[in-house]
Amino acid sequence: NSGGPIINNSKLVGIAMSVRKESENIGYIVPPPVIKHFLKDYEDARYDGFPNLGIWHQPIKGKLLPEYFGLNPKEGGVLLTGVEYGSSAFGLLHENDIILSIDNVSIARDGSIGLNENLRVDFEYLIDTHFINEKIKIKIIRNKKRISIELPLKKFVQFTPDEHSV
């Protein structure tokens, strides 16, 4: 039932979606936040999609790494290991920057943020709540100095495919 609503206890929990012909008996759900984002984005009769920072990152573990980059003992953040050419972050964020927060939401050392009292999600969820051309505020540590950056979000243009089929 691709395209049909998925209802639980009289509430919409998503829309059924099929991804691949080869994926028989596998059900995928488009959740309400994605549906709402799409509908709001399409109000101008043009779908722009989700923004993407275009970064690679890793968790900050151990005692030496946080100290080396200038993190306080109880402070979180993620270490940037790369920035995609032409992405939203290109030219503004750099390899070895530590992202501390986005829009004043602190990032844990494992890269998660608290969505509510009982649920943590990847910090990039914060980007998914925005639209192309909106700006976000990022606090970083670069060379042991704290910097605040206003970063405009762009549509991500991928130069290579995600997968190959033969």
Where are these regions (language model features)?
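Active-site loop architecture of trypsin-fold serine endopeptidases
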Residues: 1-3, 7-36, 105-114
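PDZ/PDZ-like domain segments forming the peptide/carboxylate-binding groove
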Residues: 1-5, 57-101, 105-107
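Terminal peptide-recognition signature
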Residues: 3-6, 10, 15, 30-31, ...
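Solvent-exposed coil/turn segments that connect beta secondary-structure elements
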Residues: 11, 18-20, 33-35, 58-61, ...
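C-terminal, low-ordered peptide segments at domain boundaries
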Residues: 110, 125, 130, 137-166
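Extracytoplasmic
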Residues: 23-25, 50-52, 74-78, 94-95, ...
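PDZ/PDZ-like peptide-tail recognition elements
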Residues: 36-78, 82, 156-166
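PDZ domains, with a preference for the canonical peptide-binding region formed by the helix
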Residues: 90, 101-139
